[in-house]
Swiss-Prot record:
<comment type="function">
    <text>Transcription factor that is required for infection of plants hosts. Is not implicated in the development of appressoria or the subsequent penetration of host leaves, but is necessary for the initial establishment of the fungus within plant cells by orchestrating the expression of a unique set of early invasion-related genes within appressoria, encoding secreted effectors, enzymes, secondary metabolism-related enzymes, and signaling membrane receptors. Controls the expression of targeted genes by interacting directly with a 5'-TGACTC-3' motif present in their promoters.</text>
</comment>
<keyword id="KW-0238">DNA-binding</keyword>
<feature type="compositionally biased region" description="Basic and acidic residues">
    <location>
        <begin position="61"/>
        <end position="73"/>
    </location>
</feature>
<feature type="region of interest" description="Leucine-zipper">
    <location>
        <begin position="82"/>
        <end position="89"/>
    </location>
</feature>
<feature type="region of interest" description="Disordered">
    <location>
        <begin position="1"/>
        <end position="73"/>
    </location>
</feature>
<keyword id="KW-0805">Transcription regulation</keyword>
<feature type="compositionally biased region" description="Polar residues">
    <location>
        <begin position="7"/>
        <end position="22"/>
    </location>
</feature>
<dbReference type="GO" id="GO:0005634">
    <property type="term" value="C:nucleus"/>
</dbReference>
<feature type="region of interest" description="Basic motif">
    <location>
        <begin position="59"/>
        <end position="81"/>
    </location>
</feature>
<keyword id="KW-0539">Nucleus</keyword>
<comment type="similarity">
    <text>Belongs to the bZIP family.</text>
</comment>
<feature type="domain" description="bZIP">
    <location>
        <begin position="54"/>
        <end position="95"/>
    </location>
</feature>
<keyword id="KW-0804">Transcription</keyword>
<keyword id="KW-0843">Virulence</keyword>
<protein>
    <recommendedName>
        <fullName>Transcription factor BIP1</fullName>
    </recommendedName>
</protein>
<feature type="compositionally biased region" description="Polar residues">
    <location>
        <begin position="47"/>
        <end position="56"/>
    </location>
</feature>
<dbReference type="GO" id="GO:0003677">
    <property type="term" value="F:DNA binding"/>
</dbReference>
Length: 266
């Protein structure tokens, strides 16, 4: 007689629910801890406001106010620094725009100058610099000074010859003489002979120092000694020595002589 033995291969028993779905045995109904929803872990050192005493709560609120005040101060400082940086950037941009505008105007003026030079036939300098470089070139200055007076550069007006008249005349004027000729005329307003005048040069030669005192006109004289008609001192009638007459022929410059006319001898 065969006996029915329950199978031991599977120890799992299936229980059907009223809806017909199989339900595992209580052995498999045990869930793992990871399957359960995790609860937020509390940080150490934190306490709930509800558990604080009134003094602790007041101190906590004071600390919070101080922290918020510091945060607001830092935020305000940061905003002011950003505003200053923005203003600096704007000013730099304005300076750059002004510089660009000046550069554009400078280029326009250079083009206008070049056009005017071309219109009036003025030679354009080799560089675009508004000033001629030859002004600051030492070699150009030395070469210009070493050149003759007849050659002139086109940058300068020609100057008339030295000694020419400054007034513009229809006929060319003669150049000035460097030395004036000495005049041989004894006196411009005299009609008498040469012996009637006392010729006294300002630079007396050494041979005339020994002349007698009678040949010289005295500085002090009375009214009777003067000629009433002309106001000249009367002649004393003393003949001049031959040495003085010989010295009279020396060439003396015209500007260094002094003439003292005398009245004719009575």
């Amino acid at each position: 007689m065969a006996m029915y033995m329950p199978s031991t291969a599977s120890s799992t028993t299936h229980i059907r629910s009223p809806s017909g779905t199989p339900i595992d045995s209580p052995h498999e109904m045990t869930r793992s801890p990871s399957a359960e929803p995790s609860k937020p872990a509390k940080r150490k050192g934190t306490r709930s406001v509800s558990t604080l005493t009134p003094s602790q709560l007041a101190r906590k609120r004071a600390n919070d106010r101080e922290a918020q005040r510091a945060i607001r101060a830092r935020t305000k400082e940061h905003i002011e620094r950003l505003e200053r940086e923005v203003e600096e950037l704007k000013s730099k941009q304005n300076r750059d725009e002004t510089l660009q505008e000046l550069i554009r105007k400078n280029k326009y003026l250079e083009k206008e100058i070049a056009r005017l030079r071309e219109t009036y036939g003025i030679p354009t300098p080799p560089t675009s610099h508004p000033y001629a470089p030859s002004i600051y070139d030492d070699s150009a200055v030395s070469s210009r000074t070493s050149s003759s007076f007849g050659q002139h550069s086109p940058d300068y007006h020609q100057v008339g010859e030295y000694g020419a008249s400054y007034m513009t005349t229809p006929e060319p004027s003669e150049p000035w003489t460097s030395v004036l000729p000495c005049s041989n005329v004894s006196s411009p307003a005299s009609s008498g002979s040469a012996e009637e005048y006392g010729y006294i040069p300002t630079s007396v030669p050494a041979g005339i120092e020994g002349l007698p005192p009678t040949s010289r006109v005295g500085a002090c004289m009375k009214y009777e000694d003067m000629d009433n008609e002309n106001g000249y001192p009367r002649s004393n009638g003393v003949p001049m020595p031959p040495t003085y007459m010989h010295q009279q022929q020396w060439p003396v410059p015209y500007s260094a002589t002094v003439y003292y006319p005398q009245s004719p001898a009575l």
